[in-house]
Amino acid sequence: METATLIAIFISGLLVSFTGYALYTAFGQPSQQLRDPFEEHGD
């Protein structure tokens, strides 16, 4: 394969991995530990 193709595949893989990790952190098991500033601020 050409170098440009390998670089494009590598960058695409990094982007997909980062997006998957961000979604897992936001909506998966670790989201139970996130604090909600709107619930903490009771009027």
From Swiss-Prot:
The chain crosses the membrane at residues 7-27. It comes from the Eukaryota. Keywords: Chloroplast, Membrane, Plastid, Thylakoid, Transmembrane, Transmembrane helix. One of its GO terms (biological process) is photosynthesis. Pfam families: PsbN. It is found in: Plastid, Chloroplast thylakoid membrane. One of its GO terms (cellular component) is chloroplast thylakoid membrane. It is a single-pass membrane protein. HAMAP family: PSII_PsbN. PANTHER family: PROTEIN PSBN. May play a role in photosystem I and II biogenesis. Belongs to the PsbN family. This is Protein PsbN. It comes from Suaeda aralocaspica. The gene is psbN.
